[in-house]
Amino acid sequence: MKERTVLFVDDEENILRSLKRGLIDEPYKTLFANSGKEALEVLEQEKIHILVTDMRMPEMGGLDLLRIVKERYPDIVRIVLSGYTQVTTLLTAINQGEIYKYITKPWELEEEFKPAIRQAVEYYNSKLSNATV
């Protein structure tokens, strides 16, 4: 099975540092962007399979990023990682961004976060294999 690439997007450096440390031994390639704009630049240069984004970021918020990714890269599995848990925001992300999962901050790395990302990779792989059948 080919290695999959996960792009994590968050404007908080401490979140990205924590993810880099915590995910170093995971069976997928990790890339990081500190804004929606930077994420779009990475998406133009790299083959991304999973996108994990914060919702509240300056300039381009997570919802705008999700909409663009859904339109330009519909095969990417989209996940929200956010401390912003207002129900209307969650429903908008689900409906407009067609997200696979919504993970709230703070998260439990071993019991919640890592398994969720692995499941997203498995989901991507199953979508791919079903498309080729």
Regions found by a protein language model. Name each.
Residues 32-50:
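Acidic, metal-coordinating helix/loop segments flanking the phosphotransfer/catalytic sites
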Residues 41, 63-75:
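Short amphipathic alpha-helix used as the core "switch/output" element in two-component signaling
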Residues 64, 85-103, 111:
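Alpha4 helix (beta4-alpha4-beta5 surface) of REC/receiver domains from two-component response regulators
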Residues 4, 34-38, 61-64:
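Acidic catalytic/metal-coordinating carboxylates
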Residues 57:
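Receiver (REC) domain active-site loop signature in two-component systems and cognate sites
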Residues 4, 13-31:
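Two-component/phosphorelay signaling modules centered on CheY-like receiver
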Residues 10, 54:
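Active-site residues of response regulator receiver
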